[in-house]
Amino acid sequence: MTYFVLFLGLCFVLGSLAVASNPSPYYGVVGLVLASIAGCGWLLSLGVSFVSLVLFMVYLGGMLVVFVYSVSLAADPFPEAWGDWGVVGYGVGFVAVLMVGLIVGGFVGSLDFGVATVDSVGMFSVRLNFSGVAMFYSCGVGMFLVAGWGLLLTLFVVLELVRGLSRGAIRAV
């Protein structure tokens, strides 16, 4: 199980790297799907299945819509590939930042934060999964509204960034 969780963590980092250094929106979708599946699987391994399911639906339901719009509006005749020097430079830079973070985190890692697991106190403990459901629907209404507005803002930002110098979705008619 430990190796599987480490594999999910590696897939999450590689998917995030693929989203951060994507040469065209086509490849960004692949990185986003890989990172969201790995991150939600990581949460699932901690026992927080409802939060994992909600995040998976938000990522794939909300953000893939943004990428579909951007792919349809930024139809490049010759998109850059992963092997281009600019993309490789971004990848090497991000891996260098990750390594520096791991080295610094190794020195700071002696603080021993830890993770609370499910059912650690016996029959009388409340699972993190079910308390999360109650918090989502009682105190989390404002955060759902903020997340919805954030996704709408992200849609417009990506549509503006994708259009570049050519025509885009938001243009003067």
From Swiss-Prot:
Q: Which organism is it from?
A: Aethia cristatella (Crested auklet)
Q: What does this protein do?
A: Core subunit of the mitochondrial membrane respiratory chain NADH dehydrogenase (Complex I) that is believed to belong to the minimal assembly required for catalysis. Complex I functions in the transfer of electrons from NADH to the respiratory chain. The immediate electron acceptor for the enzyme is believed to be ubiquinone.
Any stretches that span the bilayer, and where are they?
1-21, 27-47, 48-68, 87-107, 139-159
The UniProt record lists the keyword Transmembrane helix:
yes
Q: Which family does it belong to?
A: Belongs to the complex I subunit 6 family.
Q: Kind of enzyme, top EC level?
A: translocase
What keywords were assigned to this record?
Electron transport, Membrane, Mitochondrion, NAD, Respiratory chain, Translocase, Transmembrane, Transmembrane helix, Transport, Ubiquinone
GO CC, one annotated term = mitochondrial membrane
- InterPro entries, per this entry? ComplexI_Subunit6, NADH_UbQ/plastoQ_OxRdtase_su6, Nuo/plastoQ_OxRdtase_6_NuoJ
Name the Pfam families on file.
Oxidored_q3
Q: What is the lineage of its organism?
A: Eukaryota, Metazoa, Chordata, Craniata, Vertebrata
ATP-binding listed as a keyword:
no
What are its E.C. numbers? 7.1.1.2
Q: Which reaction does it catalyse?
A: a ubiquinone + NADH + 5 H(+)(in) = a ubiquinol + NAD(+) + 4 H(+)(out)
Name one molecular function that GO assigns to this entry.
Answer: NADH dehydrogenase (ubiquinone) activity
Mainly localized where? mitochondrion
State where the protein is found. Answer: Mitochondrion membrane
Its membrane topology, per UniProt?
A: Multi-pass membrane protein
| Protein name stated in the entry | NADH-ubiquinone oxidoreductase chain 6
State the signal peptide span: none
